[in-house]
């Protein structure tokens, strides 16, 4: 999206309204993480970010009073974008890993027997969450149904390690 230009040749990202609404699923997920004692840091921050972004009028008023740093970048733009992509990928991996930990804790408390690989395929089939590597999640749980954290699977371990510096 950073490179995409609209029909008039200008960056599309500059035209996207900086507000977001919520349907409640993120909030419910964060509340469940608190109930079950499962850290869900990235999803929690995403919910807070959406909440803050929805307060557009307050942010505009505050920007008239509070001074902040002027956006300025002097580094290697290509390296920055590569790092941004790696950081986004790492956050996605961590979000999935934390989500599976939440489901594991809920299953333990509620006596559920979950098919974690099947859940990944179900998401790929039409849920709000879709990703190419959902198949890799299924493979990880097929290899080790007792996997305690997705990041401990060799594929995901390698991916998170190669993205950490970003």
Language-model region placement:
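C-terminal substrate-binding/catalytic lobe of Rossmann-fold NAD(P)-dependent dehydrogenases
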Residues: 1-166
């Amino acid at each position: 999206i950073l490179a995409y230009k609209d029909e008039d040749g200008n960056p599309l990202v500059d035209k996207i309204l900086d507000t977001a609404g919520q349907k409640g699923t993120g909030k419910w997920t964060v509340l469940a993480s608190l109930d079950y004692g499962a850290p869900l840091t990235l999803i929690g921050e995403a919910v807070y970010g959406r909440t803050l972004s929805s307060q557009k009028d307050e942010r505009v008023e505050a920007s008239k009073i509070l001074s902040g740093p002027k956006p300025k970048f002097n580094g290697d733009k290509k390296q920055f974008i590569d790092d941004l992509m790696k950081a986004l990928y790492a956050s996605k991996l961590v979000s999935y890993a934390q989500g599976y930990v939440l489901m594991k804790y809920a299953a333990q408390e509620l006596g559920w027997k979950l098919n974690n690989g099947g859940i990944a395929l179900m998401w790929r089939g039409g849920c709000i969450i879709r990703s190419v590597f959902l198949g890799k999640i299924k493979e990880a749980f097929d290899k080790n149904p007792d996997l305690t954290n997705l990041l401990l699977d060799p594929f995901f371990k390698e991916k998170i390690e190669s993205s950490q510096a970003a």
